[in-house]
Amino acid sequence: GLETPDEGQVIQASNLMIHYLPQNPEFSEEDTVLQSVQNMVHHHANENELIAAKAMLTRLGITDFEQKTRELSGGQRKRLALVSVLITPCDVLILDEPTNHLDSEMADWLENKLQAFRGALVMVTHDRYFLDSVTNKIIELDKGKIYSYDEKYSGFLQRKAEREESVRASERKRQSILRKEIEWISRGAR
């Protein structure tokens, strides 16, 4: 991983392939667009992968494959990194704000790509429409607890509201019992 755990251990299957799209990808400033793709695919890209990469890059508005990465805008860098993680198969795809710097047509293209993806998708995003269209299970980490919802984002919102209302109802019931106990003790135990 990118971070060393404070404690415990990280256990990963030996053949598990994980691809990660950072929010702010970094590249070697002297590499060209195609060299950057080569460097990010975990092996030397074959001809078919390069053809696919060029098609994806073109679809995302990057057509000068010999352009140096230092000349790319932030949005172009994000799109280059996106192509680099999508070009080769993986088991787990971790995406940090994948729709940043994408217009609606590009976001639709990415949506279709991710809907066809058969691995696990872990995503951080503020794009609720996109989240609703590409997810079928949501795992929420809230106050140190993990909650799992076999729902799209819209269903998750409903189920989360129900869970939170149940917690509030339990707390109201607990408070009511405590008030009765305090009243009973105040009157004196008999």
Descriptions of predicted regions:
Residues 1-172:
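ABC ATP-binding cassette signature C-motif
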Residues 70-71, 188-190:
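Conserved short loop/turn motifs at secondary-structure junctions
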Residues 172-188:
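Short cytosolic helices in intracellular loops of multi-pass membrane proteins
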